[in-house]
Each structure stands twice: as C-alpha cells, then as structure tokens.
Amino acid sequence: MGVRDSHGEATATPDPVEKGFATLNTIRIGVKAMVQKDGELRKAEILSIRQRKDGPSFYVHYVDFNKRLDEWIDSTRIDLSHEVEWPQPEKPEKKKAGPGNKAPSKNAQKRARAGSREVSATPDLLTGKNTNIGKAQRPSKAGGKENRDETPANLSVLDSEAISADVTPKPEMEDVDMIGVSFTDTKEEHEQGKMSREEEIERLRTSGSMTQNPTEIHRVRNLNRLQMGKFDIEPWYFSPYPASFSDVDMVYIDEFCLSYFDNKRAFERHRSKCTLVHPPGNEIYRDDRISFFEVDGRRQRTWCRNLCLLSKLFLDHKTLYYDVDPFLFYCMATRDETGCHLVGYFSKEKDSAEGYNLACILTLPQYQRLGYGRLLIAFSYELSKREGKLGSPEKPLSDLGLLSYRQYWRETLVELLIEPGRESMSENELAVLTSMTEKDVHETLVVFNMLRYHKGNWVIVLTDQVVEQHNKRLEKEKIKGSRKIDPARLQWKPPVFTASSRTWNW
C-alpha cells in the first residue's frame, strides 16, 4: 500500500536497497561501496570504470559530498569487507492506455486537417518557403546565455519551429559534447523555489551546482591535472577537450594565449614562439595591482573559446564554449615583469534584452579566497553605472557565484545604510545608488533578515548581527588591506555594436 504525504496524495513506496558482498570482478557502475578517503571510510558511488595496465581504476562520487571531490581511485581504496549497495535494475516503461489510443472522432479529424492546413501555410522566417512542422528541428540557443541551454517549456511546436528557423543551426559537435536540459515543470523543481536558506546551502554543499542537472552530476571529469604558469591545478568538472587528453597525467595550458597541449615538449616549443603576454583586448582599467582587459568574442574567437573550455573545468553549469561572438569578456590580470597573468573574468552579452550585466563569472582556483571574486562583481556594477543602467547577473549562478554575489550585495547595502544621513532610504533609492536591480535589493534584504513589517509599513532594519559582521570586516581590512575598484581609473565608454556583431556568426 502506498504512503500518503501531508497533502493526502499517495506516494510510491521506495524500492528496498539490495545489499551484499562484492569482489573486484563483480563491481559495476552504480554500486555504492565504502572507500578510503583521508583516513576514513566513506560511502561512494561508482560512476565509471576503466582498465589500465596496473589494474582497474574507478571514478567515484562520495555520497552527500560536493561533486568537486569526485576522483579516480585504484582498487586498493575500496573496502570489500563491507557490504555494497547494488544499483536498482531498470524498470521497463509501462504503456498507458489513454484517450490517445482511441479512434479519433470525425470532428477531431476535421480539426486536425484544418490545423495541418494552417501549419503548412506558415512561411519559413528565413527563406519564405512553407515549413513542414513534422521536420521541426531542435531550437538553437541564439539569444540565450553563454552558460545556459534553455527553451521555454510553454512554447508550442510552431513557436519552437519559428525559433529554430530564425537562427543558424549549431555545429554537429554539440551532439557529442553538450547535454540538453529538460525544463518540464516537475513538482521537485517547483518546490526547489520554496526552499529555506539552510536547505539551499545544504544543497549547494552536497551538489556544487544551482542547475541540479542529474546528467551533468554523473558526468566523469576527463582531465587529471593542469599546468598553467607556475601552478598545478586539479580540475573539478568535465570539459570537452580532445578525447586523447584524458589518457595523459598532465595537460599544459599556456597562461597567456590559453592554447592547450598534452605533450610537454610541444608546449615548450609553443612557448618559445608565442609572443602574447596579456589578454588580447583593450586595457580599460589599471591600478597598482591589477588590470582589466575588454576582449570581443567576435574579434578574438579562438582565445575566447579557449577561455570557455578552461572555465568549463570549474563551472559545471556552463554548456556552451563555441558561441562567443555575442559576448564581451572582461578579464582581470595581475602584472609582473613576465606579463599579465589571468586571474578571472566575467562575460557579458553585447545586447542583453533583459538588461543583464553579467553572463558568466569565474575566478581561477589558484586565485580564489583572495578577494578577486568581489573585484570582478564590483567591476561589473561599475560598468553598469557608466552605462546608467541597473544590472543583474543571469541565472542560474554557480554555487560559488551565488555565495559571492550575496556577500557583495549585503556588504554594499550595509555600507550605504550605515552612513550618516541615510536613515530613510527606499529600495528604489538603494538600487539607483548601487546599480543593482530592485529585485536583487529586495531579495538581499529578505535573505539577511533586514526587512521588517512595522506599523503597517515595510522598513529596512540593520540587525545587530549584520552590524557586527560589517565591523569585523572593517577590522580585517585594516589589518590585511582591501582591494577596491577606483572609478577614476576606468577608461571606458559603453561600446556600440552593429547588428551583425551582436548576432551569432556561423
């Protein structure tokens, strides 16, 4: 008998977990076993198995841990003295008998014929020829976010056909490297928007992504290690580099031109010839420590694609790496006698219909927890101020991106509200002063419990906890120093683009 939830609806009883002892020969994908991790036994799921000369190796995901910890292990780390959990067998799909199996009525046949005539009479948006709805192709991502693959769920078949006809189709390589996302409105997705802050943080901790795409979660990381400049880096996620790169222990990336090599000798030969010592764009900001370069995705297509490939190693929700023409890339770099070393970047649509000021943001792992992420966010809002617009990042953000933005929003609002003479300010005034959207201002006030209902009105309140955190940050900045954007050093005017430079260029 099924179990009923709090709403009285019947829910399916979960299938019992099958357990038993296993050997190295019987372990298969989907098995959950106890694995040695940092001197402790932790439950891990086998996601992939590969055979090597020295024996099999297993790619595992540690249950209830962030997927960034997924790794290849050898058989000696699997404790077979404990029982394992066997994967559930795949159930055959049941054919449901419904109204669709019945013979259509005469009226329905007439409506179907009428609908067919209407569709066949619809001209193609590009060629002007009639479009056959039965040959509808998958819609392209034109006009979408650089790191998102989304088709509105409420589009009819005709609307999707019109969209795909209005843009240039994607290259064939996407069928191999990219994974589509289903946007059906499930109950689980609906309830995710109602999660508390604690539940949301817990989900970020264990999954590492705001997208929650189950196909991405189980995708195997394909590179072992990177050498970029003086740093050896361990990738976090899959990125569609050449398949042969997964067989080498180290991939070499030129930190200036971002070219990639699976052979050290080839990399050294390239370095002896490569003359690039900074991101290939206009330097629009320089202070004592850092510089910002504006790189046009259309003019520097190869470099920007290489940048997106590199980013995919650390952003699991990023799905595009070749459609860079409609984007500008603002790259932050530190300077020394050898050149300008890439620290991080954010991308921005040249013409965002929704008014977004950022599409994708990343601080490279070797520079994280040094305050550079906050500088990238602050710089994006400084550009919005120069444009005279309110800006907001596109969603979904990665887990680190979301936490960084919320911290920046809170600190920015508290700095304004704590100033003398600002005792009475509205959300609209805060938005104008910070170039944040009113929605972001409102959500930040709600998340940090700074919005209260008092005597029939909503008022902004600086709680003792918020003020204490602000004072601690100021004390830390006095000791360690702080990095801030100086608007006077920004040499930039909002660029103006032609119609051709804003669109996909295939």
UniProtKB/Swiss-Prot annotation:
Highest classification ranks of the organism: Eukaryota, Fungi, Dikarya, Ascomycota, Pezizomycotina
N6-acetyllysine PTM positions: K318
A GO CC term assigned to this protein in UniProt: site of double-strand break
Subcellular location: Nucleus; Chromosome
Mod. after translation: Autoacetylation at Lys-318 is required for proper function.
CDD domains: NAT_SF
Entry domain remark: The ESA1-RPD3 motif is common to ESA1 and RPD3 and is required for ESA1 histone acetyl-transferase (HAT) activity and RPD3 histone deacetylase (HDAC) activity.
Disordered: region residues: 83-155
Domain MYST-type HAT: residue ranges: 218-494
Keywords, comma-separated and alphabetical: Acetylation, Activator, Chromatin regulator, Chromosome, DNA damage, DNA repair, Nucleus, Transcription, Transcription regulation, Transferase
Entry's family note: Belongs to the MYST (SAS/MOZ) family.
Active site, UniProt feature: E394 (proton donor/acceptor)
Extent of motif ESA1-RPD3 motif: 301-322
Single GO MF annotation: peptide crotonyltransferase activity
EC class: transferase
Name of this chain's protein: Histone acetyltransferase ESA1
Domain Tudor-knot: 27-80
Principal location: nucleus
Species assigned in the record: Aspergillus oryzae (strain ATCC 42149 / RIB 40) (Yellow koji mold)
InterPro entries found in the cross-reference section: Acyl_CoA_acyltransferase (IPR016181), Chromo-like_dom_sf (IPR016197), Chromo/chromo_shadow_dom (IPR000953), HAT_MYST-type (IPR002717), MYST_HAT (IPR050603), Tudor-knot (IPR025995), WH-like_DNA-bd_sf (IPR036388), Zf-MYST (IPR040706)
Catalytic activity annotation: L-lysyl-[histone] + acetyl-CoA = N(6)-acetyl-L-lysyl-[histone] + CoA + H(+); L-lysyl-[protein] + acetyl-CoA = N(6)-acetyl-L-lysyl-[protein] + CoA + H(+); 2-hydroxyisobutanoyl-CoA + L-lysyl-[protein] = N(6)-(2-hydroxyisobutanoyl)-L-lysyl-[protein] + CoA + H(+); (2E)-butenoyl-CoA + L-lysyl-[protein] = N(6)-(2E)-butenoyl-L-lysyl-[protein] + CoA + H(+)
A Pfam family matched in the record: Tudor-knot
Subunit structure: Component of the NuA4 histone acetyltransferase complex.
Site (Important for catalytic activity): C360
SUPFAM superfamilies: Acyl-CoA N-acyltransferases (Nat), Chromo domain-like
